[in-house]
C-alpha cells in the first residue's frame, strides 16, 4: 500500500506538479520538465510552506520573488519541502511574494527553480514523529539570491494563489484514496491478528470489545470510501469549483478515519502494533500528518461551514 504511488508514478508532490505544468506551463516548460516527470525519469518538489508564518493562509507567504532585468531573484525560507533532498529531484516549483501591493490573492507567483541553482541551501532534513517520512523525505531550505530566467515564471506574475488552489484540490482526493486503502489494510491485519491471537483462553476475535472495534472500523472505511467516490464523480462532472465542499469533506474525513482505524489496529496488535513489524505505525503517522498537510482540519471545517451556509440559505 505505502509504495503503490511510487510504482505508478503518482507520488506527491510530483502528481500535482505535473498537473500544474500540463495546465499552465508553456510548451518549453512542458518539454523540459513535464515530459521527464511523466516518464518517471526525474522527481520534483513544491516549496510553499514557510516556518515564520502561518502557511495555512497562503496569502501570508513571504519568500521574495523580485524581478531584475531578465531574471527573478528569490530570497527567503521554505520548509516541509517534499522530495528536494533526494538526488532524483531536479526541479522545484516555488511559491513566493512577487507583487506585495497587489490585491491579496494576486500578490504571489509560482516559479520553476532547478534544484541545482546556486543559492539554494539545505538547512536541515525534517522528520515526522522523528522518523523519515514519504518516499522523498522533507526538508527546510534557505534561498539566498537565487536567480532564474523570467521564462521560468508559471502562467504569469500574481497567479500563484490560483495555481496553488487548483493544484491542492485534486491532491486532497489523492490523500483520501491513499488513506482509504491504507485503512483497509490495517483492518485486514487487525482481523488476522484477532483470529490468530489467544488471550485468557480464547481468541481475541471472540471478545466483544475487539469485535466492536472491527465493526466500527469497517463502517468508517466504507463511509469514507463512498464519500471519496462521490466527491471524485462530482469533481469529474463539475470541476474543482463545483466540488469545493466535497474537497473539504474528504480532507477532513479521510485522515481522521485512517488515524482512528490504525489506532484500533495498534491496540489489537499490542506491542507489535507500534514497532516496525507492520505498516500500521506508518499509516497512523501518514494519517496524522495529513490532518495538517495541504490545509489543517480547522481551515477545511471553516471553509465547509461557509459553503454549506451559503448553499442552504441562498
Mark where each language-model region is.
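Flexible, small-/acidic-enriched active-site or ligand-binding loops
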Residues: 60, 118-147
Amino acid at each position: 500500500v505505502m509504495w503503490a504511488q511510487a510504482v505508478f508514478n503518482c507520488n506527491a508532490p510530483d502528481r500535482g506538479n505535473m498537473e500544474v505544468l500540463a495546465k499552465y506551463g508553456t510548451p518549453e516548460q512542458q518539454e523540459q520538465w513535464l515530459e521527464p516527470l511523466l516518464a518517471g525519469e526525474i522527481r520534483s518538489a513544491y516549496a510553499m510552506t514557510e516556518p515564520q508564518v502561518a502557511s495555512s493562509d497562503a496569502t501570508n507567504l513571504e519568500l521574495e520573488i523580485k524581478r531584475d532585468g531578465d531574471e527573478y531573484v528569490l530570497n527567503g525560507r521554505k520548509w516541509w519541502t517534499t522530495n528536494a533532498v533526494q538526488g532524483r529531484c531536479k526541479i522545484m516549483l516555488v511559491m513566493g511574494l512577487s507583487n506585495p501591493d497587489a490585491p491579496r490573492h494576486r500578490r504571489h507567483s509560482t516559479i520553476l527553480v532547478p534544484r541545482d541553482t546556486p543559492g539554494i541551501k539545505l538547512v536541515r532534513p525534517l522528520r515526522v514523529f522523528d522518523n523519515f517520512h514519504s518516499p522523498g523525505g522533507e526538508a527546510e531550505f534557505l534561498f539566498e539570491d537565487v536567480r532564474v530566467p523570467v521564462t521560468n515564471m508559471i502562467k504569469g506574475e500574481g497567479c500563484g494563489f490560483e495555481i496553488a488552489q487548483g493544484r491542492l484540490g485534486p491532491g486532497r482526493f489523492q490523500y483520501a484514496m491513499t488513506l482509504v486503502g491504507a485503512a483497509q489494510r490495517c483492518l485486514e491485519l487487525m482481523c488476522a491478528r484477532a483470529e490468530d491471537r489467544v488471550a485468557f483462553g480464547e481468541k481475541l476475535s471472540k471478545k466483544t470489545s475487539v469485535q466492536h472495534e472491527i465493526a466500527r472500523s469497517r463502517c468508517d472505511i466504507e463511509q469514507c470510501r463512498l464519500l471519496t467516490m462521490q466527491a471524485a464523480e462530482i469533481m469529474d462532472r463539475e470541476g474543482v469549483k463545483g466540488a469545493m465542499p466535497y474537497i473539504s469533506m474528504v480532507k477532513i474525513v479521510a485522515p481522521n478515519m485512517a488515524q482512528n482505524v490504525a489506532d484500533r489496529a495498534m491496540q489489537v496488535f499490542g506491542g507489535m502494533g507500534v514497532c516496525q513489524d507492520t505498516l500500521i505505525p506508518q499509516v497512523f503517522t501518514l494519517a496524522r500528518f495529513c490532518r495538517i498537510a495541504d490545509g489543517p482540519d480547522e481551515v477545511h471545517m471553516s471553509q465547509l461551514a461557509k459553503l454549506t451556509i451559503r448553499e442552504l440559505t441562498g
